[in-house]
């Protein structure tokens, strides 16, 4: 109950910020980037951290046993519907947080298909290359350069004073949830994983601004944020099956 109350209070504070930010005097570029990297993004993803016990639906265990299915997908679909409703009502703030909730739930549902930690490691090693290709040569590049409205729909926003915003693609949010959930499921270091992924995202934003590029792939930073804080544990877990044989 304490965690749920904290989540609702934080959500209310974020909604209040998103409402007020456009009416506050604008910041310089670097002040805006630092605000996003070290305040807005961590605080927004703190919602995911507070909701983390829901990754395996244990809080709804009796319902799950009766209905014989997980509730991640139905709940995620409900949030998608809410996001569409808020969008139709021209209330992007509501749509923004519904997208964050929906993709987080889908990420935790996706995690249930990973039967071994090695699968998670493999994904963490592969997706940075896929994301890099997509951002620099593939569909993400085409969407961000020629279809800004599509990217807006398929991303979450972090609003700064003056009304400007940085955006993070929904696949990035999904894998943030996957790796955070995996750190709990496989007995790794959830807190350090959470902090590591936030550092990876923050550095990605700072480097993109410093190098004056339109955008950098976010998944390399997220993957490293998962792999590096857990490197010794991951190595031990991978060696254990070999030693048993």
Task: Describe the predicted segments one by one.
Residues 1-245:
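A membrane-topology feature that recognizes alpha-helical transmembrane segments
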């Amino acid at each position: 109950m304490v965690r749920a109350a904290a989540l609702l209070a934080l959500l209310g504070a974020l909604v209040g910020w998103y409402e007020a930010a456009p009416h506050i005097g604008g910041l310089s570029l670097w002040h805006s980037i630092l605000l996003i990297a070290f305040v807005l993004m961590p605080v927004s993803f703190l919602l995911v951290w507070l909701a983390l016990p829901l990754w395996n639906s244990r809080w709804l265990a009796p319902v799950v046993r009766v209905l014989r299915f997980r509730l991640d997908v139905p709940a995620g679909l409900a949030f998608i519907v809410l996001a569409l409703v808020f969008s139709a009502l021209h209330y992007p703030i509501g749509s923004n947080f519904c997208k964050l909730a929906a993709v987080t739930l889908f990420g935790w549902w996706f995690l249930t298909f990973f039967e071994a930690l090695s699968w998670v490691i493999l994904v963490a090693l592969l997706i940075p290359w896929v994301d890099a290709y997509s951002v620099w040569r593939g569909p993400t590049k085409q969407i961000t350069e020629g279809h800004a409205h599509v990217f807006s729909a398929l991303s979450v926003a972090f609003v700064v004073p003056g009304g400007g915003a940085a955006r993070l693609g929904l696949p990035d949010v999904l894998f943030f949830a996957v790796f955070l959930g995996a750190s709990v499921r496989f007995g790794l270091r959830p807190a350090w994983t959470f902090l590591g992924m936030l550092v990876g995202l923050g550095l990605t934003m700072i480097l993109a601004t410093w190098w004056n590029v339109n955008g950098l792939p976010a998944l390399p930073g997220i993957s490293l944020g998962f792999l590096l804080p857990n490197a010794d544990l991951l190595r031990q877990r991978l060696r254990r099956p070999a030693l048993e044989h």
